[in-house]
């Protein structure tokens, strides 16, 4: 269910006996939903969910809230799908993908607090007639950029169609409704997906054939159908008889209208290739002449779990106050326990209210002291030692997947300055906020620019821990940066200790 009104054939008004309050858990008498959101009008609904416009009571920011009935979801076996959608939306943070802010639950309802996209569905725009080529191209560029970003993170949408593409007030496209999405770990031993899903008019022939299919190739087929619809105003494969339409899809029987340019027709013929082995890839689409015209790769960074788009030339780094810098935050605790879906466990607890924030709220960001984070105020020696492999705090570089940590006795400003110098060697952009540094690469790719976060935590009054982790981008590029630039450049700042430092206890 998209966070905007669905197309007219799916929308119906609430009956007189059912109000928004009773359906969504909105308190009677104008109260707040779970004490946090003012629920507004119903935007639309499907079989299992309703979407309401709402407003944050703390910040006043408008949001969309998707409400699901927990009992109905469990009865129809949708709980794994819901959990997977939550995990996927947190994995694919991109300017052209609808954002998930928070997930809340009561004993009877599940609430998705999402970005409110005011412009409506792309379907509504094309229903009025075909689009101009430059307009269609811009939407297609944003669609393919978002889809390629998802694929690079092992996510395959599987239900791409104009009804699931929204347009915001700035005219930018947003991909929504990941309810049928698959992740790479769902592949069968043959490396393919086997579940039939999607809308027949937009589904690739190998999916209709109910044989194993490549999720990325199936998604790019759907993108081609969408492009054809935007440019022609009708579907390339259409027939009143469903089986006749299937035959046309299997055979690839379609014709481009005479107003399609040669480059566009060539691109569509390569996308709508019935053989997935020879079908064009996302990378090849993005390199095509028709796609490249006027294309500006999206540039963005993620900070505090918020997606921030960058305008051209917006590379300035916010300066730290030159006077007394804020104290560094305490050393971070271990990440929360996660279940097999990569989602924090406990969301379907029997407690009356459970909340699983995807980001800090605007109010929390305003109230948070400069330089502090939402972490415990203090940790004892055992907590800190447990972070280091084998209880070893010798100061050597420690690697944990996409994270690198080391201990230093150097002044924090010296460490930050060195990080900036290393980044500039690679012509990376640098952003500073308190004792955090964000290093952003310039090389574009399906995964977006490489983004590295570095943060300094106080271990003792004389020692700090520096934590570096990949926040976005290609892992190989990150590993190369760490091995060739970061580790050699920071090695002289690493503090080598003969024993574990004297860490104050909680009672001191």
Curated annotation (Swiss-Prot):
The gene is CIPK19. Its cofactor is Mn(2+). Belongs to the protein kinase superfamily. CAMK Ser/Thr protein kinase family. SNF1 subfamily. Residues 313-322, 338-347 have a biased composition (Acidic residues). This is CBL-interacting protein kinase 19. Residues 354-398 form the NAF domain. Pfam families: NAF (PF03822), Pkinase (PF00069). InterPro entries: Kinase-like_dom_sf, NAF/FISL_domain, NAF_dom, Prot_kinase_dom, Protein_kinase_ATP_BS, Ser/Thr_kinase_AS. Residues 1-24, 311-372 are annotated as: Disordered. It catalyses: L-seryl-[protein] + ATP = O-phospho-L-seryl-[protein] + ADP + H(+); L-threonyl-[protein] + ATP = O-phospho-L-threonyl-[protein] + ADP + H(+).
């Amino acid at each position: 269910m998209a966070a905007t009104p669905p197309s007219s054939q799916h929308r119906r008004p609430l009956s007189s006996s059912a109000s928004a309050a009773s359906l969504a858990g909105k308190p009677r008498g104008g109260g707040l939903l779970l004490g946090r959101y003012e629920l507004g009008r119903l935007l639309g609904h499907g079989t299992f969910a309703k979407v309401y416009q709402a407003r944050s009571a703390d910040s006043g920011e408008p949001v969309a809230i998707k409400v699901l009935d927990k009992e109905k979801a469990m009865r129809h076996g949708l709980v794994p799908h819901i959990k997977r959608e939550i995990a996927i939306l947190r994995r694919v943070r991109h300017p052209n993908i609808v954002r998930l802010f928070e997930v809340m639950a009561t004993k009877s309802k599940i609430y998705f607090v999402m970005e409110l996209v005011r412009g409506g569905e792309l379907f509504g725009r094309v229903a009025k007639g075909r689009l101009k080529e430059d307009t269609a191209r811009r939407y297609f560029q944003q669609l393919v950029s978002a889809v390629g970003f998802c694929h690079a993170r092992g996510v395959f949408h599987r239900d791409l169609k104009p009804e699931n593409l929204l347009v915001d007030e700035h005219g930018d496209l947003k991909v929504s409704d990941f309810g049928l999405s698959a992740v790479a770990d769902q592949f069968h031993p043959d490396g393919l997906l086997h579940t039939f899903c999607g809308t027949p008019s937009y589904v690739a022939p190998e999916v209709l054939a109910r044989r194993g299919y490549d999720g990325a190739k199936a998604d790019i087929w759907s993108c081609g159908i969408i492009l054809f619809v935007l440019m022609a105003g009708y579907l390339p494969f259409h027939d009143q008889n469903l089986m006749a339409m299937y035959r046309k899809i299997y055979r690839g029987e379609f014709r481009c209208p005479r107003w399609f340019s040669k480059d566009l027709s060539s691109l569509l013929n390569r996308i709508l290739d019935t053989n997935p082995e020879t079908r064009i890839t996302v990378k090849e689409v993005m390199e095509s002449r028709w796609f490249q015209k006027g294309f500006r790769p999206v540039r963005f960074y993620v900070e505090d779990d918020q997606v921030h788009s960058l305008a051209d030339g917006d590379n300035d780094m916010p300066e730290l106050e030159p006077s007394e810098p804020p104290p560094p935050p305490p050393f971070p605790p271990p990440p929360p326990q996660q279940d097999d879906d990569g989602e924090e466990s406990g969301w379907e607890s029997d407690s009356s209210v459970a909340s699983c924030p995807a980001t800090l709220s605007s109010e929390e960001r305003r109230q948070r002291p400069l330089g502090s984070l939402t972490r415990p105020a203090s940790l004892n020696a055992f907590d800190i030692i447990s972070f280091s492999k084998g209880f070893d705090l010798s100061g050597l570089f420690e690697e944990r997947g996409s994270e690198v940590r080391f201990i230093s006795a150097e002044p924090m400003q010296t460490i930050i300055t060195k990080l900036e110098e290393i980044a500039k060697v690679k012509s990376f952009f640098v952003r500073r906020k308190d004792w955090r540094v964000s290093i952003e690469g310039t090389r574009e790719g399906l995964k977006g620019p490489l983004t590295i976060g570095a943060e300094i935590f106080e271990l003792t009054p004389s020692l700090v821990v520096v934590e570096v982790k990949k926040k976005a981008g290609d892992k190989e590029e990150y590993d190369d940066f760490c091995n060739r630039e970061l580790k050699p450049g920071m090695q002289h700042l690493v503090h080598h200790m003969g024993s574990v430092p004297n860490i104050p206890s909680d009672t001191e």
